[in-house]
Amino acid sequence: MFRKIIYPLVSGFCLQLSLSGADLLKPYTGPSVPGVDTSTLTGKVMAGYQGWFNCEGDGADLGWTHWSRHKDQTFGPGNVTVDLWPDVSEYDPDELYETGFRFEDGAAAKVFSSYNKKTVLRHFAWMRDYGIDGAFVQRFANGLRDPTKKAHKDEVLSHAREGANRNGRAYAVMYDLSGLPKGGTKLVETDWRELRDKMQITNDPAYLNHKGKPVVTVWGIGFMDGGKPRAYTLKECYELVRFLKADGCTVMLGVPTGWRTLDRDCAKDPLMHEI
């Protein structure tokens, strides 16, 4: 059972003709079926949905991102970043992309793209079939500075929203701050306003709430990388959490393992506990 859902959940989707940003960032008006209780996080089994795999020819113009070490070169022998090969036996032909790998009979090995709408909807259908309540759709904040990468993230989120609604699942936004420069948390504030105002994401029936408020997760607060603090500061993170809470959100954090004792991979700063 799990071999068919765990690895592909880090994907997204594809449309041969991508929607424009204006079409993506609008309220959802499609079908929505009842399913899991989206009013609470309590008791939920949620997956993390990275949506970061791309394939040459998928329409995203991001090459072989996260499949290959060099995204502008074919995903094949000597150009690999993944540890596992996905089970693609249930995908349709229009969801698969030829790689540089070959089977013994000479046939090309194929993988999925996170830019394929059909694939994202399939993943949420699998969640329904196998008892996964929903997904935290990750938005890697550092990529919000790049229009091409942001367009990809918007498309993944748009189709995850549709997949959740069509399959009675829950979804929520998870921001990953990794790689942000100093001052970069302002990108998250701007992005959240856009999702709230243009997509009206917090009014969506499939969006996860907790204690009467929409859930937003912020991952990457207080980490030390190689013994050094990250470029974006704890003070910035503090202000970001304050912003989200003032906007009426329930805020969930992703923090280092040493957060309680302020050691190991965690910044030795009491502001961590205030956050």
Question: Each PLM stretch: what is its role?
Answer:
Residues 1-4:
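Positively charged n-region of N-terminal signal peptides that target proteins for export
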Residues 7-18:
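Bacterial N-terminal signal peptides
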Residues 22-275:
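Glycan-processing catalytic domains of CAZymes
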